[in-house]
Amino acid sequence: RQQQIALGGEAMAQGRAAKLLRPGAREADVATVAAGMRRLRRDGYLAAAWMLAHDDIHCWLADYRGRLSVWCGEQDAITQPELAQGVALRYGAPYIAIPQAGHASYLDNEIFFNQQLLRIGEEVRDECTN
């Protein structure tokens, strides 16, 4: 990760932006991801990358008592869908595969992603009013 960030935001954006999306992603979506990568700050990026590589999500989820669902793009090359499914199974949570989507599923399939957000909002609203 340090090598990636040492090359600079522009080089990282050029080399990695498309990998966060599904194969054949829209150029506008690749440009959106690349623009975000160009704005990354070295220390923040390295801290986040370290946490993702070294922290154990199970330590956090073992004590979690709230509602949980696991979402993953069907074509995610960063977080493998099989591993996301395993997390859902382990914690008895629903697994939602986001069709035609990579890691940045909110860009690849924004309609499906937003429908899921709206569904959750309705569930929470219904809980609060019943």
Over which residues does each language-model region extend?
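Short, structured coil segments at secondary-structure junctions
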Residues: 64, 90-91
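Short beta-strand/loop motif that positions the catalytic acidic residue
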Residues: 63-64, 70-72, 76
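Catalytic active-site module of serine/aspartate enzymes centered on a nucleophile-bearing elbow/loop
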Residues: 91-130
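Conserved alpha/beta-hydrolase "acid-adjacent" motif
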Residues: 77-83
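Residue-level signal for the nucleotide or nucleotide-sugar donor/cofactor binding architecture
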Residues: 40, 79, 108
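Structural signal for short hydrophobic segments within the conserved structured cores
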Residues: 50, 69, 94-96
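Hydrophobic "lid"/C-terminal helical patch
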Residues: 16, 49-52, 87, 113-117, ...
